[in-house]
């Protein structure tokens, strides 16, 4: 069941306690058979709005949203939410260009939460648990949700939290490094957050995944015009 992530008020205070969220909403939904998955409905609103509301409720500062593909339509779906929206003109070059653009736009901070826009089950509680885990991480470590089977890593989840030191590395060499490269090449930098919460692992990349998650087949009438 998809949780209702429509809070009435933000949880943050004037003091910045949480990482700055960066929501990656520039992708082309290439496996969705012509649908822009970010505009398909979750709990009656476009998925990108659903996820943005979750991050906005958790964060102390307006999340940074990186737009790209169908930027006008996605921006319209986010109307009325306190966000910092930017457009990545290089979005077709891959996800890391959007990560870099978001990190630059976010400016200096202690930590950043890099979040995908197709996580329909992600909740404020998931974000808070990830943030709590990150406080136990070592200096310079990246906190990553992980699910284990038989004591072994079965899969990594999203969002992840990166510190300022990783931000500098990614901005300097995003094309060759990136979050995945940083994690694969430097496993010592990973601080694993063991969690079985579906919010970290259920994403929507295909029409079948949308149907499995919502119980509905995607339809052109569902998307925002």
Q: Predicted regions: what is each one?
A:
Residues 2-21, 168, 174-225:
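Conserved alpha/beta core of the MobA/IspD/sugar-nucleotide pyrophosphorylase nucleotidyltransferase superfamily
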Residues 35, 59, 79-82, 186:
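Short, structured coil segments at secondary-structure junctions
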Residues 38, 62, 84, 189-191, ...:
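Conserved beta-strand segments of alpha/beta enzyme cores
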């Amino acid at each position: 069941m998809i949780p209702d992530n429509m809070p009435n008020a933000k949880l943050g205070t004037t003091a910045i306690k949480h990482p700055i969220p960066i929501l990656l909403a520039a992708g082309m939904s290439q496996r969705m058979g012509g649908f822009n998955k970010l505009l398909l409905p979750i709990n009656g609103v476009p998925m990108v709005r659903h996820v943005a509301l979750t991050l906005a409720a958790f964060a102390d500062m307006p999340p940074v949203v990186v737009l790209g593909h169908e930027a006008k339509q996605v921006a319209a779906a986010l109307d009325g939410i306190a966000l910092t929206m930017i457009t990545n003109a290089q979005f077709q070059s891959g996800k890391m260009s959007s990560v870099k653009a978001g990190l630059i736009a976010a400016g200096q901070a202690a930590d950043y939460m890099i979040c995908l826009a197709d996580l329909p089950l992600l909740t404020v509680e998931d974000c808070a648990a990830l943030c709590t885990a990150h406080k136990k991480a070592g200096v310079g470590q990246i906190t990553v949700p992980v699910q284990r089977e038989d004591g072994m890593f079965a899969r990594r989840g999203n969002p992840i939290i990166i510190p300022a030191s990783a931000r500098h590395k990614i901005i300097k060499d995003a094309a060759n490094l990136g979050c995945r490269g940083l994690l694969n090449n430097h496993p010592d930098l990973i601080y694993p957050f063991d969690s079985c919460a579906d919010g970290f692992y259920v994403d929507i990349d295909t029409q079948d995944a949308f149907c499995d998650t919502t119980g509905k087949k995607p339809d052109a009438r569902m998307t925002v015009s």
